[in-house]
């Protein structure tokens, strides 16, 4: 999955400002791209990053969200 890949600068040395989706934070974050190599989690704008990967956050929340535990009152 594109959106779960780590930010990867690549082997070149350009300092191109790009965005990647950070699954830990559940949002897009800036990073510097070297200009070659790298991976597909590399977007020109934050808006485009969120358009592609924003649903990943809601899908992962649905998988990890559980019903709250209900407890019977303790009787002494």
From Swiss-Prot:
Residues 1-76 form the BPTI/Kunitz inhibitor domain. A motif (OX-2) lies at residues 56-76. Gene3D superfamilies: Pancreatic trypsin inhibitor Kunitz domain (4.10.410.10). SUPFAM superfamilies: BPTI-like (SSF57362). It is found in: Cell membrane; Membrane; Perikaryon; Cell projection, Growth cone. Keywords: Amyloid, Cell membrane, Cell projection, Coated pit, Cytoplasmic vesicle, Disulfide bond, Endosome, Membrane, Protease inhibitor, Serine protease inhibitor. Binds, via its C-terminus, to the PID domain of several cytoplasmic proteins, including APBB family members, the APBA family, MAPK8IP1, SHC1 and NUMB and DAB1. Binding to DAB1 inhibits its serine phosphorylation. Interacts (via NPXY motif) with DAB2 (via PID domain); the interaction is impaired by tyrosine phosphorylation of the NPXY motif. Also interacts with GPCR-like protein BPP, APPBP1, IB1, KNS2 (via its TPR domains), APPBP2 (via BaSS) and DDB1. In vitro, it binds MAPT via the MT-binding domains. Associates with microtubules in the presence of ATP and in a kinesin-dependent manner. The OX-2 motif shows some similarity to a region in the N-terminus of CD200/MOX2. This is Amyloid-beta precursor protein. It comes from Macaca mulatta (Rhesus macaque). The gene is APP.
């Amino acid at each position: 999955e594109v959106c779960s890949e780590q930010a990867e600068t690549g082997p070149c040395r350009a300092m191109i400002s790009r965005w990647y989706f950070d699954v830990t934070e559940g949002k897009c974050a800036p990073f510097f791209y070297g200009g070659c190599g790298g991976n597909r989690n590399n977007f020109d704008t934050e808006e485009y990053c969120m358009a592609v990967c924003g649903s990943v956050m809601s899908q992962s929340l649905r998988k990890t969200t559980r019903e709250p535990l209900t407890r019977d009152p303790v009787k002494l």
